[in-house]
UniProtKB/Swiss-Prot annotation:
Keywords: Acetylation, Guanine-nucleotide releasing factor, Methylation. Residues 214-362 form the cDENN domain. This is DENN domain-containing protein 11. Residues 15-187 form the uDENN domain. One of its GO terms (molecular function) is guanyl-nucleotide exchange factor activity. Probable guanine nucleotide exchange factor (GEF). May promote the exchange of GDP to GTP, converting inactive GDP-bound small GTPases into their active GTP-bound form. May play a role in neuritogenesis, as well as in neuronal recovery and/or restructuring in the hippocampus following transient cerebral ischemia. The modification Omega-N-methylarginine is found at R41. It comes from Mus musculus. Residues 1-59 are annotated as: Disordered.
Length: 455
């Protein structure tokens, strides 16, 4: 079997089978409606009818900060644009549709700092109420005016980051086209006319665009739709890159800490690490997460985002700008390639890998090897490795919160070392993590695990 390295191009996106979405009256009206602790845009469409011999999918729900409902959401491309690097003026928006849309800052988001060092890249980012995907390319030219290199990005904006992947190949082709034939926008204009979305204004919104809301991790839709939200190989590479440290990231993600990942370009694969990090914190138990902010994938950020990051209490993002490391007020956890660190004293214990972490990592790898073996020998690629990764952490998180909820509902509300071991945690090594978890989620239990440092 040939394994793909972390720096290798990710495999093409793979879609799973269509999923039937249970309807309730709040969802059938379409437009922007409230759901759980947030809001989201849903399309008014009847659920897909399941064939007689088709088993019902398990009712598990995962997506962190999801804004779309899988196969029932229509295309919603709200802008298409071309960004160029001008040797005299710097990054600038060369062309866009619609012409009156606010694209301030997109010229820097879609062409990451340091991009001149790579030949091509792709970048996910957030712009106000939208998410963007841009494909960048750098072509040598014999032009003194352009200083020997022509650099452009072609991108789109959408209310949902989970649908952007559909247009990756188109954007890659179009940025090459723009490099070779600058100023020819007919294909992009036709694409926008075909895919443009109309955002419905709800009561009291007038004609203004709705703000972004983050749906809770717990809702009714089905796991198989998750398969369209990431490229094949994404989470496998995530595990290989971080190794046992994914358990450290898991704890910080579950605590909804502000996580900033630094890496030099190319930034595309780092955007996938942002997404994978958010997936570590999925929970499908009712009653969990109502008092804690959602894990927000901001994807690529730069110095222009500092003001917006200052007011965020929870996010996962990546950057190519080393200056962020000095701005400690903006993050709780800083990841420099594979080095995970925090400047908060009370979070320092979470940086240590303990015996329970090693056991979880061993089990994860054991399950991965069994899956890969069955795929090779039996040719069975369902479930895939990505399913295994997401469900592994979902099960772990559910086990923790199920235990905590049961203890909080008991008469004495006492959480013991035996409970900790039953949750797959180290009673001493994870004591600080458990205390932070109880506080963050507002769970009323009494922790009676002795602190080995305080006899």
């Amino acid at each position: 079997m040939v394994e793909q390295g972390d720096a290798a191009p990710l495999l093409r996106w793979a879609e799973g089978p269509a999923v039937s979405v249970p309807q309730d009256p709040a969802l059938q009206a379409g437009g922007w409606v409230r759901g759980g602790s947030g809001e989201g845009r849903v399309a008014a469409e009847a659920p897909r009818r399941r064939e007689p011999d088709e088993p019902a999918p398990p009712e598990v729900l995962l997506q962190p900060g999801r804004l779309e409902l899988g196969d029932v959401e229509e295309d919603q491309v709200v802008a298409v644009f071309v960004v160029t690097f001008d040797p005299r003026s710097g990054n600038m928006v060369e062309w866009c549709l619609p012409q009156d849309i606010d694209l301030e800052g997109v010229e820097f988001k879609s062409m990451a700092s340091g991009s001149h060092k790579v030949q091509s890249d792709f970048i996910y980012f957030r712009k106000g109420p939208f998410f963007g995907l841009a494909c960048f390319a750098n072509m040598p030219v014999e032009s003194e005016l352009e200083r020997g290199a022509r650099m452009k990005s072609v991108g789109i904006l959408s209310p949902s980051y989970t649908l952007l992947y559909r247009y990756m190949h188109f954007l890659e082709n179009q940025v090459r086209h723009q490099l070779e034939m600058p100023g020819h926008y007919s294909h992009l204009a036709a694409f926008y006319e075909d895919k443009k979305g109309v955002l419905h204004a709800g009561p009291g919104r007038g004609g203004s665009l709705p703000p972004v809301y983050w749906l809770p991790s717990i809702h009714r839709y089905m796991y198989p739709e998750m398969k369209i939200t990431h490229p094949a190989g994404c989470m496998s590479q995530f595990i290989k890159f971080f190794g046992e440290q994914i358990l450290i990231l898991w704890k910080f993600a579950l605590l909804r800490k502000r996580i900033l990942i630094f890496s030099p370009p190319p930034v595309g694969v780092v955007c996938y690490r942002v997404y994978c990090c958010c997936c570590l914190a999925n929970v499908s138990l009712p009653g969990i997460g109502g008092t804690i902010p959602e894990s927000k994938p901001f994807f690529y950020v730069n110095v222009a985002d500092i003001e917006s990051l200052e007011v965020e209490v929870s996010y996962v993002a990546c950057t190519t700008e080393k200056i962020f490391e000095e701005k400690r007020e903006l993050y709780d956890v800083y990841v420099d390639n594979q080095n995970v660190k925090t400047h908060h004293d009370h979070l320092q214990p979470l940086l240590k890998i303990n015996s329970a972490d090693r056991e979880k990592y061993r089990r994860l790898n054991e399950q991965r090897q069994m899956l890969l073996y069955s795929q090779e020998v039996e040719g069975d690629y369902s479930p895939c490795e990505e399913d295994l990764f997401v469900l592994f952490f979902l099960e772990q998180n559910n086990r923790i919160f199920q235990t905590l909820l049961e203890v909080s509902a008991s008469q004495d509300k006492t959480l013991t070392a035996e409970h900790a071991r039953g949750m797959g945690l180290d009673p001493q090594g994870d004591r600080s993590f458990l205390m932070d978890l109880l506080e963050a989620y507002g769970i009323d239990v009494m922790l009676v695990i002795d602190n080995p440092c305080c006899p």
